[in-house]
């Protein structure tokens, strides 16, 4: 992401913590540029349409955290009919599971249906940015009824 942004931790880049802090900020800044993007199953175009999985892939790629990720077709209701943890195992390829509390830019995966099937970017727990099927990309609170009480796992993609 090259938008003229200057990392506030630039003076700490020679430390692992400083470089990681800048990456976390870059992820959240990129995620904010997706706000208002309509929901579209398997879409991955900012401003035109995305779902929660594709938004994560595009945001972390644009911020330089992961390479381009090709995702094979999945039906919109895959999580209702399968026990296979496709999303969870895919996340584990690119991020390390952490016990929490999550930090800025970490990923929260929520259980929907029979498996972990909804991802969001943590802003400041429980504040999130995610793509919601009825509303598109928006800020949310994990304490809202749609997410509250659901099993959730956290991942650090900055490893």
Regions found by a protein language model. Give the residues of each.
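Surface-exposed patches in mature extracellular/periplasmic domains of secreted proteins
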Residues: 39-43, 67-72
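Generic structural signal for secondary-structure transition and capping sites
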Residues: 36-39, 96
């Amino acid at each position: 992401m090259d938008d003229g942004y200057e990392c506030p931790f630039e003076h700490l880049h020679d430390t692992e913590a400083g470089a990681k802090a800048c990456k976390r900020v870059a992820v959240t800044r990129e995620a904010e540029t997706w706000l208002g993007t309509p929901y579209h199953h398997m879409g991955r175009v900012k401003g035109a349409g995305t779902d929660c999985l594709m938004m994560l892939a595009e945001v972390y790629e644009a911020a330089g955290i992961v390479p381009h990720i090709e995702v094979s077709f999945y039906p919109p209701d895959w999580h209702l009919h399968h026990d296979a943890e496709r999303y969870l195992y895919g996340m584990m390829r690119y991020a390390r599971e952490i016990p929490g509390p999550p930090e800025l830019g970490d990923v929260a995966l929520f259980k929907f249906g029979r498996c972990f099937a909804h991802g969001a970017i943590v802003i400041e727990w429980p504040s999130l940015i995610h793509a919601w099927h009825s509303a598109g990309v928006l800020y949310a609170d994990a304490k809202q009824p749609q997410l509250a009480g659901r099993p959730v796992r956290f991942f650090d993609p900055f490893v």
